[in-house]
């Protein structure tokens, strides 16, 4: 049974998922054509083109179902409408690490997360540690490379 839990995301993430869904739906007829063409080659038991096209069809249909589910449960959040002194979904947070090096992250949904772009999932170890914190709070995060310590220096809603 599908979950009814809301999926928080920014408008940018919603648009990205919508574009992915449209691209996959556009690919559907191409896959059907590839299956028909491969089927025309005869014996399906040893027809690699046919099996590859059927496998791709299964992947595309599964991804379409997943995207439609996420989009139907999406709760689009505009961080510019938020305020407060605590870190919440959508906030942009400046932290200082153990070497006094500032790092900046925005708390986003799982589908939008891209650490290199400064976007971390609210469900990630760091994201979970940040939610609810305030400026001057110290946090400890256990990541694969070990324990990291940060100081929250700024919270913005941009």
From Swiss-Prot:
One of its GO terms (biological process) is DNA-templated transcription elongation. GO terms for molecular function: DNA binding; RNA polymerase binding. InterPro entries: GreA/GreB_C_sf (IPR036953), TF_GreA/GreB_CS (IPR018151), Tscrpt_elong_fac_GreA (IPR006359), Tscrpt_elong_fac_GreA/B (IPR028624), Tscrpt_elong_fac_GreA/B_C (IPR001437), Tscrpt_elong_fac_GreA/B_fam (IPR023459), Tscrpt_elong_fac_GreA/B_N (IPR022691), Tscrpt_elong_fac_GreA/B_N_sf (IPR036805). PANTHER family: TRANSCRIPTION ELONGATION FACTOR GREA. The keyword Transcription applies. Gene3D superfamilies: Transcription elongation factor, GreA/GreB, C-terminal domain (3.10.50.30), Transcription elongation factor, GreA/GreB, N-terminal domain (1.10.287.180). Necessary for efficient RNA polymerase transcription elongation past template-encoded arresting sites. The arresting sites in DNA have the property of trapping a certain fraction of elongating RNA polymerases that pass through, resulting in locked ternary complexes. Cleavage of the nascent transcript by cleavage factors such as GreA or GreB allows the resumption of elongation from the new 3'terminus. GreA releases sequences of 2 to 3 nucleotides. PROSITE patterns: GREAB_2. It comes from the Bacteria. The gene is greA. Keywords: Coiled coil, DNA-binding, Transcription, Transcription regulation. This is Transcription elongation factor GreA. Residues 53-75 form a coiled coil. It comes from Sphingopyxis alaskensis (strain DSM 13593 / LMG 18877 / RB2256). Belongs to the GreA/GreB family. It holds the Pfam family GreA_GreB.
């Amino acid at each position: 049974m599908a979950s009814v839990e809301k999926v928080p995301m920014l408008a940018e993430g919603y648009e990205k998922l919508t574009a992915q869904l449209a691209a996959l739906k556009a690919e559907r007829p191409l896959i059907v054509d590839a299956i028909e063409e491969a089927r025309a080659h005869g014996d399906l038991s040893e027809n690699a083109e046919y099996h590859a096209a059927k496998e791709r069809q299964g992947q595309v249909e599964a991804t379409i179902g997943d995207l439609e589910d996420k989009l139907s449960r999406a709760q689009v959040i505009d961080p510019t409408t938020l305020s407060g002194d605590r870190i919440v979904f959508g906030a942009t947070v400046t932290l200082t690490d153990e070497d006094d090096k500032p790092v900046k992250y925005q708390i986003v949904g799982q589908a939008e997360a891209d650490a290199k772009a400064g976007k971390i999932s609210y469900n990630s170890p760091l994201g979970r540690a940040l939610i609810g914190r305030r400026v001057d709070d110290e946090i400890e995060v256990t990541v694969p490379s070990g324990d990291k310590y940060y100081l929250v220096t700024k919270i913005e809603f941009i």
